[in-house]
Amino acid sequence: MAAGSAADGREGAAVHARAFLYRHAGWLLPLAFAVLVTLLGQWWSPEAFDPDEGINLGKGALVAAGYHPYAEIWNDQPPVLTYILAGVQTVVPWSVGAARVAILAFACLLLFSVFVLVERSAGRAEAVAAIILLGTAPLMWRLSISVMIGLPAVALAVAACAIVYGRDRAAPWRAVAAGLVFALSLQTKLFTAAALPAFLMMAYLADEAGPRGRRAATAATALAATVAGFVAIAWASGEPFLAQLIGPHVAGAVRSDYSFIVTAGHFAEHLVQQPFVVIAALLALTPAGRPAGRLRLAWLAWLGVAAVSLLGHTPLRYHHMLLLLVPLVCLGGEASWRVLRAAWPARWRLARYRTALAVIVPVVAVAYLVLMIRPFHDDETPGVNEAAERLAAHAVADPWVATDQPFDAFVAGLLVPPELVVFSIKRIETGNLTPEMLLATIAARKPGQVMLRRTHADRTVRDYLERTYVPLDPRRLHYLRPDLAN
């Protein structure tokens, strides 16, 4: 009797534990994601995961030092993440890890918001499937601790959708709040404009029992709040919208290289790197997996507009695909659960294959785990950033360095001249950064150090540096101002 009671107690505790995990999956799964990324991802890598990390960190450091994000800094992106990184820099100076923690917080917000939306529109089990798909996507792992603007922008866009799409009657304050959050998304990275039609559809669908007029008013309120928030941020930050935020991305020098075939090839290449997301999304095309959730049309709108936008963009880079990943996991999460539920009654048929499954399932699981963490382990990660250490050796004497790798400068605790902190290939290709501009900035600012190790240095620039600076490392084109060499 006692043994039976103990067994019943253990079984009851297990049932309660499973119920607790299922009931609170919305925040437990993002928390588990953060823990796994912290344990498996190379958080404290002294090298940048992407060149854009250095640009964003450098801009944040300059704004924290009192520089205007547009009047003094050449900047072709919206300002929200720059302001956030400036705040991080103020609280925890020169910490790459702290900045990556901020991005991981946005990743958790994205996972939670996806869960909320899918749960409200399709069900809790479908939401768990969607969040697992997104949380195990290799792209999500890579971007979750890369100091880049795409993930925060997408996270804010999905959060805005989660705010506006409630179970109960839509309230005006919710539409206003959602619109303001979507404005923050746009002012983080403009590519989330592709999600705007889906956002407005969700605002319209939020009050399904209400009359059409009231639903249209909710969508109009959300749109008005988005426009008002966007304009307010643009005005407060003084952003040159057409000249710098739009112009460099549609310049003739960039568009002349556009090829649909090449872009479509990159599109397919980046997409197949998220295999389980693609497979789950394809299940939505099957009769058993066809989504029936209330937001399926909104997700299809997001997917379609995003796909067209990305196929028309040049250059298309891997991190742009996150915009496509959100609707794919939401549709795929529902579809995969519906297929599993439809196949469950026939599960006994798998018994004859249990030996093969006992081998195949663990192999697939391990292979997928390796695929997830591969972005962090493609190459042997160095223990130190040698270039940053060389810069840091002379950092006390002068806090400035002109460099084409601002990540090195940030790790060394140095500022990059505001005219040069956005040292990107696109800026060079569009003529917004020429050798003459580089030379003029170095001559005017007279930074304590110059290091050009990422891009080709013009002969004129080299000659000037040889005449006016002391060479320290020819391989990295590292130069020191003469008065600091004594």
Where are these regions (language model features)?
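Membrane-interface alpha helices of multi-pass inner-membrane proteins
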Residues: 130-131, 174-190, 196-201, 224-225, ...
